Amino acid sequence: EIISNVCASVEEILKPKTIALITDTRKSSEVISSWISEGFSHNVEILNYGVLPSGSMPILLNELNHDMGIIISASHNPSEYNGIKLIDKNGSKLLDDGENLSEENMDDIQLPENDSSIKNYHLGYESYKKFINSINDIDFSNFDLLIDSANGSVFKIIKEIVPEIVRKMTQIAKKQNGQNSNEE
């Protein structure tokens, strides 16, 4: 209920028309997505780009021209602490003033009668991959890398990008199951 109320408050204050959504690998991302949908009205288009690293959000906002972004993540905390991070259209965490306004407004907020729907959209994966591949001012071709994916959101994309630019890559903690992010 809190997440839905925060989203309704954000809509009332910031009036976004399009929102980029990315998630981590935790199973709770699905239920949190539904709470986000309940909080925004049908006037807000939410595009779910799926499991991507948090650092991809500024790229998505810039490349795909969204009004704001939402990241579902517990960062480096256990799964039970999964929640949302609100990101402004410039790719920065929503300023504390905006957070304070939405918190003050939450007591009076009513959830919309017609929820927004979340559309799955996979262009974000390719946009992020293209951006990472465009970083070519460092020559990694003589590097052997060990990458700890922490069973998190980087587990999939890293194995597509890194082998192309390094001599040898070994990836560990790459078997996410929805509950083991940041575990060995």
Where are these regions (language model features)?
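Generic hydrophobic secondary-structure packing signal
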Residues: 2-3, 65
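Short, flexible, glycine/charge-rich loop motifs used to bind or transfer phosphoryl groups or to couple energy/partner
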Residues: 10, 57-60, 135-136
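N-terminal small/polar loop signature for handling phosphorylated ligands or for N-terminal nucleophile
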Residues: 18-81, 161-184
